[in-house]
């Protein structure tokens, strides 16, 4: 149930004791955790997340990555934006690189990076932009 999912993530993200507090009293990181929990609570098929790791401490970042992988392994899909290329390279099986509203490349991760790294591909694509 939604309450079970909420309680599970609240416990994992160490927010259980704060759930009855006003959100305005939350730190930026706590608000970010709450947004992530609210995205998962209804068990959607698709999540669209904008910079989901901004403001998170290392433990919360790890937990979000773990939750994202579990979500996808259970048939869900996630579109997320990030400026941290290592995270995208590790988590994503498909990607799109967009610069100034222009789609520079899209495809399966292994086809895009080949024997390189995502950072190298990004720098090559955006060097003359």
Enumerate the predicted regions with their spans.
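Short, small-residue-biased leader/transition segments that mark boundaries at the very start
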Residues: 3-5
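Catalytic Walker B motif of ABC-type/P-loop ATPase nucleotide-binding domains
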Residues: 47-51
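Helix N-cap at the start of a conserved alpha-helix in ABC-type nucleotide-binding domains
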Residues: 58-60
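Helical segment within the ABC ATPase nucleotide-binding domain
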Residues: 62-74
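A short, surface-exposed alpha-helical micro-motif characterized by mixed small hydrophobic
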Residues: 88-90
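ABC ATPase "signature
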Residues: 106-107
